Amino acid sequence: MIRQWPSPAKLNLFLYITGQREDGYHLLQTLFQFLDYGDTLTIDVRQDDAIHLLTPVAGVPDEQNLIVRAARLLQQHCDRHGLNTAPRGAEISIEKRLPMGGGLGGGSSNAATVLVALNDLWRCGLSDEQLAELGLALGADVPVFVRGHAAFAEGIGERLQPANPQEKWYLVAHPGVSIPTPVIFGDADLKRDTPVRPLNVLLQATYANDCEPIARKRFREVEQLVSWLLEYAPSRLTGTGACVFAEFDTETAARQVLNQAPEWIRGFVARGVNVSPLHRIRSGQIEP
């Protein structure tokens, strides 16, 4: 039985804001790819219905933590629909590698890993599609992590189409600041009218992120980081930031640049993968 479950990072290889709904949600087109790097969750089934997070995050109550919320959401769904009467409790701990507020999808990935893992461990029998639909209540990015394949997303991020971008190597760097998503989406200067284009057109265009100009304007550290990385390779913001990634054809090239990074830059090198490590471990392609 698997105890340790990967919770991978994601990159937005491009991100375009195409409009805004009356309820305030932004419409977008984005290309998600996973990284072979992320957090690790250790999950053990309890013989009661208690959900215990053994590694709480300072300043974040359990009822707001996406790990706990995901476990309780699945628990309530299974109870409501009478799915398996086996004990459905869990003890969960996390080895955290991904920065908060970095644009790497850490919280959404954690929630998705909990849904996928506990669905297996509790023998709930839900399909990935059902789990993805359930996970949407936790965040717009959760479904792509649940489904586990690189994807082109539209709408508010919930309409997913499988995609297979090149699996390049990336230097992912954090400027030392966290950027709350509302800071970017609430900025009056954010471009919200990028034309909607079909995927085949977007894949042939130069990739960009409509959130990047706002992040660079409002956070001097992001501006400095992007400017430094652009000296070495094509680089851009992921999500709403604050992490920036530079793309390379080889791991060696990426590590050479990381080794030259100033002390204020914290980063790692990882490979882009189109099948999530979470799903590869479930299918036995990689060892737990």
UniProtKB/Swiss-Prot annotation:
GO MF annotations in UniProt: 4-(cytidine 5'-diphospho)-2-C-methyl-D-erythritol kinase activity; ATP binding
Family the UniProt entry places it in: Belongs to the GHMP kinase family. IspE subfamily.
Catalysed reactions listed for this entry: 4-CDP-2-C-methyl-D-erythritol + ATP = 4-CDP-2-C-methyl-D-erythritol 2-phosphate + ADP + H(+)
Pathway annotation: Isoprenoid biosynthesis; isopentenyl diphosphate biosynthesis via DXP pathway; isopentenyl diphosphate from 1-deoxy-D-xylulose 5-phosphate: step 3/6
GO term, biological process aspect, one: isopentenyl diphosphate biosynthetic process, methylerythritol 4-phosphate pathway
Gene3D superfamilies to which the protein is assigned, alphabetical: 3.30.230.10, GHMP kinase, C-terminal domain
Enzyme class: transferase
Record: residues binding ATP: 99-109
Keyword Signal: no
Protein name: 4-diphosphocytidyl-2-C-methyl-D-erythritol kinase
Function recorded in the entry: Catalyzes the phosphorylation of the position 2 hydroxy group of 4-diphosphocytidyl-2C-methyl-D-erythritol.
The entry's keywords: ATP-binding, Isoprene biosynthesis, Kinase, Nucleotide-binding, Transferase
UniProt-listed Enzyme Commission number(s): 2.7.1.148
Catalytic residue list: 10, 141
Subunit composition and interactions: Homodimer.
